[in-house]
């Protein structure tokens, strides 16, 4: 018995010292007792915070202007009352919403010394962002299918892409996003957090939160990987197959005007898909030992994509340009 006591004390003391040194004022390893997290943000010199704040402010202003403007144009112009613009309006709403989940808090943290976020706030941020980013992936797949029907079966377009089907596709996208978000959020916050409260990111994301856990992450990562495959593979397959048929059909069109019209809408959609999926793949394939690269990728799909989407669709789409001009003329902005 005497020989076993030192071994017991040697086991207990490092754990206690680790709790004190890494957890600070939290003083517990139980996630249910945790009251907040600290968003570490970017590892830059303090004097660069003002520059980052101005950059985030500019991007967020562009997101608000572009996406609110796009939704307003689509709702006010009868010529844009088509399935494609119904999907585009929902895409603008999603971009506006999920950027608003992240950016305001990130901008506040550039100025505030208190960079904490409440436990409930962190849960809400992860849940909403996961819901909306997955919904956007399914919505982009629905938009690819819409382009496939419009180009490959134009005579049946109004019949096949009915209002009911469009509503079902959008509702299904939100439903899939909600189910995925519930699973991801519940898995993340049932972990035991026994490391620092500091989340090495500018918002609450699942991977940085996993780094704070002392639980066995094998099963968690396997479920996350399976969930990602279930989400990403079907959407990518729908997009790729749709565009294979689209390209095959467009190549059979002999008129130059037909080529331009087909590629103008398709190239806009492909640009949005490329930016979003490219950033997502880059972020999740980046090893954990390079957290700064992961943050850069997160910036692409959380800030850059919502800013670029309205620009991509407006610059490459004559219908949107004409609707915007008509809207501005009504408001007497253009003399």
UniProtKB/Swiss-Prot annotation:
Residues 72-79, 146-164, 243-262, 316-335 are cytoplasmic. Its main location: membrane. The keyword Membrane applies. Disulfide bonds join 122-214. It is a multi-pass membrane protein. It is found in: Cell membrane. Gene3D superfamilies: Rhodopsin 7-helix transmembrane proteins (1.20.1070.10). Residues 1-50, 101-124, 186-222, 284-296 are extracellular. The chain crosses the membrane at residues 51-71, 80-100, 125-145, 165-185, 223-242, 263-283. Glycans are attached at residues 30, 114. One of its GO terms (molecular function) is odorant binding. GO terms for cellular component: plasma membrane. Keywords: Cell membrane, Disulfide bond, G-protein coupled receptor, Glycoprotein, Membrane, Olfaction, Receptor, Sensory transduction, Transducer, Transmembrane, Transmembrane helix. InterPro entries: GPCR_Rhodpsn (IPR000276), GPCR_Rhodpsn_7TM (IPR017452), Olfact_rcpt (IPR000725). Odorant receptor. Belongs to the G-protein coupled receptor 1 family. This is Olfactory receptor 9K2.
């Amino acid at each position: 018995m005497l020989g076993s006591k030192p071994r017991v004390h040697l086991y207990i003391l490092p754990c206690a010292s680790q709790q004190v040194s890494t957890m600070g004022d939290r003083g517990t390893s139980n996630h249910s007792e945790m009251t907040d997290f600290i968003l570490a943000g970017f590892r830059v010199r303090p004097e660069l915070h003002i520059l980052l704040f101005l950059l985030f402010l500019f991007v967020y202003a562009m997101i608000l202007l572009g996406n609110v403007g796009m939704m307003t144009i689509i709702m006010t112009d009868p010529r844009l009352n088509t399935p494609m613009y119904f999907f585009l309006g929902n895409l603008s709403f999603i971009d506006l919403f999920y950027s608003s989940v992240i950016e305001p808090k990130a901008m506040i943290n550039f100025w505030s010394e208190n960079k904490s976020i409440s436990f409930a706030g962190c849960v809400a941020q992860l849940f909403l962002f996961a819901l909306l980013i997955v919904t956007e992936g399914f919505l982009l797949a629905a938009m690819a299918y819409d382009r496939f029907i419009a180009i490959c079966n134009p005579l049946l377009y109004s019949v096949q892409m009915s209002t009911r089907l469009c509503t079902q596709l959008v509702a299904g996208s939100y439903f899939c996003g909600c189910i995925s978000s519930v699973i991801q959020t519940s898995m993340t916050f049932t972990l035991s957090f026994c490391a620092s409260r500091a989340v090495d990111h500018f918002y609450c994301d699942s991977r940085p939160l996993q780094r704070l856990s002392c639980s066995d992450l094998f099963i968690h990562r396997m479920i996350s990987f399976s969930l990602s495959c279930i989400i990403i593979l079907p959407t990518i397959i729908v997009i790729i197959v749709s565009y294979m048929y689209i390209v095959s059909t467009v190549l059979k069109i002999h008129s130059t005007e037909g080529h331009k019209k087909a590629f103008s809408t398709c190239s806009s959609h492909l640009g949005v898909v490329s930016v979003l999926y490219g950033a997502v793949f880059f972020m999740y394939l980046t090893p954990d030992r390079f957290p700064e690269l992961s943050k850069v990728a997160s910036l692409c799909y959380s800030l850059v994509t919502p800013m670029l989407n309205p620009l991509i669709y407006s610059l490459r789409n004559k219908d949107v340009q004409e609707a915007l001009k008509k809207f501005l003329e009504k408001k007497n902005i253009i003399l």
